Amino acid sequence: MSLDVRTITPSESAEWMRAVSTGFLTAGTPSEELVADRFAGADLSRTQGAFEAGRCVATFRSFAQELTVVGGATVAADAISGVTVTPTHRRRGLLSRMMATDLAAAKERGEPVASLIAAEYPIYGRYGFGPAAWTSVWEVSVYRAGLDARRSGQPADGGRIEMVDGADVRKLGPEVHGALAARQPGVVTRDERWWRQRTGAAPSSAHEKWTEPFYVVHRAADGTVDGLMTYGTDDTWGDAKQPLNTASVRDMIALNPAAERALWHYLCSIDWITTIRSGYRAPDDLLPLLLPDPRAARMITNADWLWLRMLDVPRALEARTYGTEASLVLEVRDDAGLAGGRFLLDASTGGARCVSTTRSADLVLGVAELATLYLGDESVRRLVDLGRAEESRAGAATTADAVFRTGRRPWCPDVF
């Protein structure tokens, strides 16, 4: 039976969502409310499906996104999501066909990069994607943290913690997140639907059961909101009637270390909470060092997270700033023919110029490896040692590391 791979029509949105749910191991039919919310304002020209006898057996969509790069500028990204293939139709090239169509369209639109969160590591490298930012989850033993159990939940520097509700977060959150996005490489845009969904004002995905969380904000001494946290708790008691409750952070953004410290210390101060799970944080997050005993924080997850794919090398490299002034000739290899070439990068702390060149290459690397370097998280020397990049000029890897690396690691707090 033939397979029809194409963009979907409005009447097929519910069937497409059913296939997505199947791919994410959630049985059943999505509600009409969820389908309507998911497709409100959606660009169906960027929503693909594979159909067999009217049944959707593979899904793929993309949407417009802004990605913060090193230096605080943003680039337009082709954000890819909802990628599934029904188990009965694996290994038929369906993802490859949909990916090729989408990336070609993104390049035609002029988007310098594509982005995604990879559910599985081995899938996306063959399409030119590389892991550009990692994520970590920390588990904190409150009893071992070394904080004074008699303290209040309020900071001592004139700031204060306030409990708020979802409506407050929808009003205050976008400004705080926007300020974070202006400085943190790896942050991606959050639209209105994101805030509505994470505060219960819009239906959650079929595989995400909604429970109302707690919301708090941190106000600086002048009253400015410079941090917010969303968290849930369980209800667990030991045999001796001792509380063994865990607070699990769903979202936490802070614009300075004082706000970050105040929010974590507040969470540690709540009666009955004995364990904290941090949610997705940067691997070099300050959390352990904000506790008197950093060993109370144990990293329980450290994994690749945000994957990028270069579509326009000069535009992407010119968008970010660099650690030092240097010139490098990069030969970028791309089997898909979308972004390969030889490029001269004149980098500086204030920006860069990147153009095609015929000069001899200093470094030879794949398009996926360049994506891995783009936000400053990976070492060129490591890639050379692994055989994933070639140093054509002695010392080029050391120079490239000085150019690309950053003092703090990139971080993408979101799933999309």
From Swiss-Prot:
InterPro entries (UniProt xref): Acetyltransf_17, Acetyltransferase_Eis, Acyl_CoA_acyltransferase, Eis_dom, GNAT_dom, NAcTrfase_Eis, SCP2_sterol-bd_dom_sf
GO molecular-function terms, A-Z: aminoglycoside N-acetyltransferase activity
UniProt: acetyl-CoA binding residues: V83, T84, V85, R91, R92, G93, L94, L95, S96
Top-level EC class: transferase
Pfam families: Acetyltransf_17, Acetyltransf_9, SCP2_2
Active-site residue numbers: Y124, F416
One GO-annotated biological process of the protein: aminoglycoside antibiotic catabolic process
Keywords carried by this UniProt record: Acyltransferase, Transferase
Highest taxon of the lineage: Bacteria
Record Gene3D superfamilies: 3.40.630.30, SCP2 sterol-binding domain
Signal peptide: none
EC number(s) recorded for this UniProt protein: 2.3.1.-
Domain N-acetyltransferase: 3-150
Annotated family: Belongs to the acetyltransferase Eis family.
Subunit structure: Homohexamer; trimer of dimers.
UniProt name for this protein: Uncharacterized N-acetyltransferase SGR_3976
Lineage: Bacteria, Bacillati, Actinomycetota, Actinomycetes, Kitasatosporales
